[in-house]
Amino acid sequence: MKYELTATEARVIGCLLEKQVTTPEQYPLSVNGVVTASNQKTNREPVMNLSEHEVQEQLDNLVKRHFLRTVSGFGNRVTKYEQRFCNSEFGNLKLSPAEVALIATLLLRGAQTPGELRSRASRMYEFSDMAEVESTLEQLAARDDGPYVVRLAREPGKRESRYMHLFCGEVDEPVSSDDAPQAASGDLHARVEALEGEVAELKQRLDSLLAHLGD
C-alpha cells in the first residue's frame, strides 16, 4: 500500500477529514486552524502539542505528496489547506461517508473497538447499528486496493476486538487472551468523549462567529 504516514501526518489528515464534515463552514483550514485541530484535547489520542512550525512542515510535506492542496485567492487572506487523501477528483482512494468517518477516527485516536468507533465517529456519520460499523470495518479490511484496517487480537478482559488503520504501516498485534470477558465501560466513555467533542465544536464555531462579528 502506497500510504505510509508518520503519526503527525496521520493526525493532520485525520483533522482535515473530520473538519471537512463537522465544520464545513470553516473548511478548508488555515495553518492556525490545523494547529488548533491537531492539539485538540477531545477525540484525540494521544493529545499533542504541535507548534505552528511543526504543523507547517507536515503540511508542506503532505502537499508535495499530493495528499493535500493549498487554496488561496477569492478573498482568502491566508493560505488554506484541503485534503486530497480520499475522494479527490483524480485520486484513487474512494471512500463512502461511513468509511471516511471510521478512517478519520482511527487516524485521530488509534486502535478502537467497534463500539468506541460508533460513538466517536457519530458527528461525522450516524451508524444505524453495530452491525453497520462492523460490516464497514470488514469491507475496509478486505478491499482489493487495501487492506486499510486490521482487526487486532482481543485484549484481556475485553468483550470486543479493536481495529487499527494501516496508513502508518503494519501493526504489531497484542497477544490474544482467553480470559472471560468482563463488563467494560469503554462504550460509555466513548459516548462521553463524543459529547465533549460536540461541545468543543460548538465553542469553536462560536469563537469563529464572534471573531467574524468583531471584524
Curated annotation (Swiss-Prot):
Classify the source by domain of life.
Bacteria
One Pfam family recorded for the sequence: DUF480
Query: Which InterPro entries does this entry report, sorted A to Z?
Result: DUF480, WH-like_DNA-bd_sf, WH_DNA-bd_sf
What family is this protein classified in? Answer: Belongs to the UPF0502 family.
- The name this protein carries in UniProt is UPF0502 protein CKO_01995
- Organism annotation: Citrobacter koseri (strain ATCC BAA-895 / CDC 4225-83 / SGSC4696)
